[in-house]
Regions:
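Acidic, low-complexity intrinsically disordered segments
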Residues: 69-114
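General helical secondary-structure elements
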Residues: 18, 59-61, 85, 95
Length: 114
């Protein structure tokens, strides 16, 4: 039996002129190896910065909120999806789209404080 070859999917979706969601998914067969979904904001021309990131680093799905300097505003907030990773990915994506304005607004407040 040959070893399963990892499948990597990278996708980027522009959700408004200054906001995009980047998806990085790695799986082996039906097993999720790594998932990262990041809401990014273009603070100036071609300067995209991570605002919120969901990922499975460390083996647990969690959310990090980031500051303009790249530090953690919140770190490793556990996320309970209780679903298969296909549905979790969809729920995270949909949640980021629906809350993008709020997340970016909070991020921009921090930009003004810097």
């Amino acid at each position: 039996m040959s070893p399963r070859i990892p499948r990597v999917i990278k996708h980027e979706v522009l959700i408004r002129p200054d906001a995009r969601i980047r998806i990085h998914l790695e799986s082996k067969g039906s097993e999720l190896v790594h998932l990262a979904i990041t809401l990014e904001h273009e603070v100036s021309l071609h300067d995209w910065r991570a605002v919120v990131r969901y990922d499975t680093e460390g083996g647990v799905l969690h959310r990090d909120r980031l500051t303009p300097s790249g530090d953690y505003l919140t770190h490793r907030e556990r996320v309970q999806m209780g679903l298969d990773w296909h549905q979790a990915r969809k729920n995270i994506f949909d949640g980021l789209v629906s809350r993008a304005e709020w997340h970016i607004g909070e991020y921009r407040k921090l930009l003004r404080e810097d």
